[in-house]
A protein has these predicted regions:
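Membrane-proximal basic amphipathic "stem/tether" segments
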Residues: 1-36
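Active-site and donor-binding regions of nucleotide-sugar-utilizing enzymes
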Residues: 40-124
């Protein structure tokens, strides 16, 4: 019986590896076929922004459409959330980045439905 459980566990891991590998390969192949790749940089604070060179390189390339989404830091007080998002959003807009405001009608937007990014970089 022990031998059967061992075989089943091994089979389970082999199936999981196969599915992960093929799903990842499928997504990469699908992304490579796209003419325009939407890249979203999700940033919680302007001080953590370290992707300036990558953003500018993507902005210059005709195949990429980068944008920045300023996210509220949920670990801070609720009264400071909107103020920090506003100041960070204004900072990125002044620097000339394509920014998206995270609130619509007082609620956070659904990133997948509204922005439809192909690649998301999250910086905290």
């Amino acid at each position: 019986m022990e031998h059967i459980y061992k075989l089943l566990r091994s089979f389970k891991w082999d199936c999981a590896k196969y599915l992960y590998k093929n799903t990842l390969n499928f997504k990469v192949k699908r992304l490579r076929r796209k003419k325009n790749i939407r890249v979203l940089f999700a940033v919680a604070e302007s001080a953590t922004w370290k992707s300036d060179c990558l953003y500018k390189a993507m902005a210059e390339h005709p195949r990429f459409t980068p944008s920045i989404l300023v996210l509220p830091d949920e670990q801070k007080e609720k009264t400071l959330l909107k103020e920090e998002v506003d100041s960070c959003f204004n900072l990125f807009c002044r620097k000339g980045y394509a920014c998206t405001y995270p609130y619509q009608n007082g609620k956070l937007i659904n990133i997948r439905k509204k922005l439809k990014p192909d690649i998301i970089f999250y910086q905290k």
